């Protein structure tokens, strides 16, 4: 099994290109099920989760063709064509690899009137129940049955019908499933307390390019006017705000100066506020966001929250950065339980962190030391990379398959800005 070896103490300096957003593309790809025409997504990241999504869509009858992007967008593009649906069953052996597989449920149900999807796998972060997804589809008339580890959903005669969906708590995935189901439902659907994340906006923009009628994009109340059919489109995947924030933390902890090429400030406003508060110099430039660490890091008090609040997906990376900040930091995780699994590994490297319930108290230390550490989930693994970049000596991060789910060409990007990092097989 691969591991990543890092020799810390090198200041990061240069440009890091930000890839297409993982959390956006994993909703955009299932949207191809909503039309028999082709959907082309530009700025496709090279990630294990993208490969898993391709495998699942192929199983359902979607043809996928990946090519090098043309024009102004570097990297890859994918064309997905679901001219016929070969199966409405998303099997366990594929779905278990990736939680986002549940996002085929809404599109399949909307187009075919039925869907059977295995309960999902993916990150080991709390329970992440899918009950909000199911309640949303029931509000559109679906009949839902849970049996033998599968969700079986069936639309009423004549297909899904518009309705009112009111989420008791904000859920990104449930909002995405509800939107994709509603665009082909008969009549009008109102979604109250919808998630407002930039990835939701990106999905809506793609669906509208395909002919969907959605009002209120970017707000917590969406009104969707169902269509008989959608057509094909070409859409550019938004830049990954979590990847950009992660590399900002890496620049900060190494005293670096890095331009996050392609990052959009509007997508990560609260992260930038906290980075500035920690003592970093942040400037928005024509082609990205520049992060300069020209002063000692300062401790922070922050809580995770749905967008536009501080993202839970950045909590672990900030914790690693704050391990070397002056003073005491207090982090409160309000979104997921059990999202402090990286703490014991950071402590092995010399961090002073105490966790009580949903609150973590980080007392800044003068230095970290390299160690062998184990990644437990996607963002936790990145926190260990960040800590290792500043640690004295060598760190080996095991179970790096977690990183491959969400960070494209990690070693290549960090090496290009001065990190001593390599992937070791076996």
Curated annotation (Swiss-Prot):
The active site is at residue 123. GO terms for molecular function: UDP-N-acetylglucosamine 1-carboxyvinyltransferase activity. It comes from the Bacteria. Its EC number is 2.5.1.7. GO terms for cellular component: cytoplasm. Pathway: Cell wall biogenesis; peptidoglycan biosynthesis. The modification 2-(S-cysteinyl)pyruvic acid O-phosphothioketal is found at residue 123. UDP-N-acetyl-alpha-D-glucosamine binds at residues 99, 128-132, 313, 335. Phosphoenolpyruvate binds at residues 22-23. InterPro entries: Enolpyruvate_Tfrase_dom, Enolpyruvate_Tfrase_sf, MurA_subfamily, RNA3'P_cycl/enolpyr_Trfase_a/b, UDP_GlcNAc_COvinyl_MurA. It catalyses: phosphoenolpyruvate + UDP-N-acetyl-alpha-D-glucosamine = UDP-N-acetyl-3-O-(1-carboxyvinyl)-alpha-D-glucosamine + phosphate. One of its GO terms (biological process) is regulation of cell shape. Keywords: Cell cycle, Cell division, Cell shape, Cell wall biogenesis/degradation, Cytoplasm, Peptidoglycan synthesis, Pyruvate, Transferase. It is an enzyme of class 2 (transferase). It is found in: Cytoplasm. Pfam families: EPSP_synthase (PF00275). Cell wall formation. Adds enolpyruvyl to UDP-N-acetylglucosamine. NCBIfam families: murA, PRK09369.1. HAMAP family: MurA. Belongs to the EPSP synthase family. MurA subfamily. This is UDP-N-acetylglucosamine 1-carboxyvinyltransferase.
